[in-house]
Every structure is written in structure tokens, then in C-alpha cells.
Amino acid sequence: MDELIKEFDRYMDLERNLSTHTRKNYLSDLNQFKIYLEENHRVPTELKTEAWQNVDYMMVRAFLGALYRRRVKKVTIARKLASLRAFFKYLHQKRKIQCNPLEAVSTPRTEKYIPAVLSVDEIFVLLNLPFPEDVFGLRDRAILELFYSSGIRVSELTGINEEDMDFSQGLIRIRGKGKKERIVPIGQPASEAVQRYMMKKPGSETSGKAVATCPVPLFVNRRQGRLSARSVARILSKYVSMSGLQKQISPHTLRHSFATHLMDAGADLRSIQELLGHESLSTTQKYTAVSVNRLMAVYDRAHPKARGGH
């Protein structure tokens, strides 16, 4: 990898505290741009500082144009542009380049993203399935209950350790994006589901003794290793198929449903922002749009004037 990209990655890790997932996206986007420069602008394979110095805004615009022609989604293009902005801003601040070519490139408008959500009835269909009573069935129930009860991200769920659970207070310590910690409440059904799982989980009885030296993952696979995000998605997919719900449902759908149902019940945006671990309130505001859309749908179905009645 190019040395300056490596430096930028270290900066994002140590000084900006960005998550591994975000840094991986940055590196992927920057390496894609690097390959584009090599193939289309005869920039040397081993990019040096001088080569980055020669990148101008026309090259960046041509790269974005190539993405548009390949019909890459606008939201993905916007993310790639954000990666380039962060990288060239870093190079400019560190005086690796004299001019920042991204200052002349405007950000494209993206479609307003409104997340998919499940209704409360659909959530109950999923959570009331007959889960197996072995340790893995108990684990799977605990995972689904915890997702809907707390609204955490899949990366946060897989990162939970046994010592992060405070059953007496009904709280979990969560390590979120940018390695930031927050405390999240969970409801009684989720708390009980996790405790039933832990009672059958191998080695869980002695986990308290191991806390000081080595964190004990809460959710584990058959080899007692920490469950991966991909495995969690597969587990959810299995139960969605069993439920008969004809929808694409991911772990993030449960997070969106959690937030939207709180909004529907009258929770304020600031509280939802804190629960979800959003840095910006504008990120949380998309749930307002979901709630308004749902409200309008109910109005259209129920109000006589909406149906053209007299």
C-alpha cells in the first residue's frame, strides 16, 4: 500500500479513533482511486508524495464520472468522495501537498434515505417464534431480543463481553463507533433471554474470574469464539425465513425499527440520538421522516376525508 495512505490510516486510528469498519471503507475507496489514477492518468504504480501533488480536481471529477457511468449508487459515490476529502485534507494539513484538489469539487446530492422498518406486530411475530431450547437456540433468542430492546449495531452486539452486562440495573456497556463507550438500557424480556443463555453457555459460570485478564465474549460460536457480524446476519436470516415475513430484514432493520417505535411512542430526538450512539442529531432525524410517513399512511387508511368520503 502507498506509504501516505498507511500514514493516513494510522492517523485515523490513533488520533481520530475511527472504527475498523470505517477505516476499512476509507482504505478501499483510496485504493480504488489509486488504481484509477494508475490506469487512466499514467500515475506511477508506487505513488510518491510528488505523484499525489500532481492530482488535480479534473482527475477527481473524471473518477466520479467513471463511477456514475458504472451506475454506482449516489450514496456510495458520496462516501467515496468523503474518503478522498478526508485523505487530501490530511495531506494538505501535514504539508505533503501544496493545494487540496478536493476544495474545487462539490458534493453530489444524494437521495434522502428512509430506512425500512418492521411494525410492532411483525417484531412480535419474529420474537415469538419457537426457538430451540439448546444453548444456541437460547443464544439466538437473546440476540434478537437484544437487538430490538437496545437498538445497537451488529458490530456493537458482537463486541459485547459478559462483564458489560449489568442485570441488576438493566444496562449494557456498549463500545460504539470511534471506540466511544455508552451505557444503554435493556428491557426485562431481553435481560431474561440473555441470562437464560448465559446459564447454559459453556464456561459462563467461571467467566467472572477471567474478567481481569481476558474479556469473555457474550455471544460465541460452536468453537467458543466471538460471533462474527456475518454469522449474526445468517442467524437472523434463518428466523426471518421461519417467520414467513416477506421482507428483507437485516440487523440494521431491527435497529431502525427500535428507533422508529420509540419515535412513534413520543420519545424525543435527543434521547433517541443518545441511545443509538449518533454523533449528529441530523442522522437521527431520518426517523422523524419514517414516523411522519407511517402517520400519513394511517391517516389515508382511516380518515374518511382522506378516502374522498363526505
Swiss-Prot record:
<feature type="domain" description="Core-binding (CB)">
    <location>
        <begin position="1"/>
        <end position="92"/>
    </location>
</feature>
<protein>
    <recommendedName>
        <fullName>Tyrosine recombinase XerC</fullName>
    </recommendedName>
</protein>
<keyword id="KW-0132">Cell division</keyword>
<comment type="subunit">
    <text>Forms a cyclic heterotetrameric complex composed of two molecules of XerC and two molecules of XerD.</text>
</comment>
<dbReference type="InterPro" id="IPR050090">
    <property type="entry name" value="Tyrosine_recombinase_XerCD"/>
</dbReference>
<feature type="active site" description="O-(3'-phospho-DNA)-tyrosine intermediate">
    <location>
        <position position="287"/>
    </location>
</feature>
<comment type="function">
    <text>Site-specific tyrosine recombinase, which acts by catalyzing the cutting and rejoining of the recombining DNA molecules. The XerC-XerD complex is essential to convert dimers of the bacterial chromosome into monomers to permit their segregation at cell division. It also contributes to the segregational stability of plasmids.</text>
</comment>
<keyword id="KW-0233">DNA recombination</keyword>
<keyword id="KW-0238">DNA-binding</keyword>
<dbReference type="GO" id="GO:0006313">
    <property type="term" value="P:DNA transposition"/>
</dbReference>
<dbReference type="InterPro" id="IPR044068">
    <property type="entry name" value="CB"/>
</dbReference>
<keyword id="KW-0229">DNA integration</keyword>
<dbReference type="GO" id="GO:0051301">
    <property type="term" value="P:cell division"/>
</dbReference>
<feature type="active site">
    <location>
        <position position="252"/>
    </location>
</feature>
<dbReference type="InterPro" id="IPR010998">
    <property type="entry name" value="Integrase_recombinase_N"/>
</dbReference>
<feature type="active site">
    <location>
        <position position="153"/>
    </location>
</feature>
<feature type="active site">
    <location>
        <position position="278"/>
    </location>
</feature>
<feature type="active site">
    <location>
        <position position="255"/>
    </location>
</feature>
<dbReference type="InterPro" id="IPR004107">
    <property type="entry name" value="Integrase_SAM-like_N"/>
</dbReference>
<feature type="active site">
    <location>
        <position position="177"/>
    </location>
</feature>
<dbReference type="Pfam" id="PF02899">
    <property type="entry name" value="Phage_int_SAM_1"/>
</dbReference>
<keyword id="KW-0963">Cytoplasm</keyword>
<dbReference type="GO" id="GO:0005737">
    <property type="term" value="C:cytoplasm"/>
</dbReference>
<dbReference type="InterPro" id="IPR013762">
    <property type="entry name" value="Integrase-like_cat_sf"/>
</dbReference>
<dbReference type="InterPro" id="IPR002104">
    <property type="entry name" value="Integrase_catalytic"/>
</dbReference>
<dbReference type="InterPro" id="IPR011010">
    <property type="entry name" value="DNA_brk_join_enz"/>
</dbReference>
<dbReference type="GO" id="GO:0007059">
    <property type="term" value="P:chromosome segregation"/>
</dbReference>
<feature type="domain" description="Tyr recombinase">
    <location>
        <begin position="113"/>
        <end position="300"/>
    </location>
</feature>
<keyword id="KW-0159">Chromosome partition</keyword>
<dbReference type="Pfam" id="PF00589">
    <property type="entry name" value="Phage_integrase"/>
</dbReference>
<dbReference type="GO" id="GO:0003677">
    <property type="term" value="F:DNA binding"/>
</dbReference>
<dbReference type="InterPro" id="IPR023009">
    <property type="entry name" value="Tyrosine_recombinase_XerC/XerD"/>
</dbReference>
<keyword id="KW-0131">Cell cycle</keyword>
<dbReference type="GO" id="GO:0009037">
    <property type="term" value="F:tyrosine-based site-specific recombinase activity"/>
</dbReference>
<dbReference type="InterPro" id="IPR011931">
    <property type="entry name" value="Recomb_XerC"/>
</dbReference>
<comment type="similarity">
    <text>Belongs to the 'phage' integrase family. XerC subfamily.</text>
</comment>
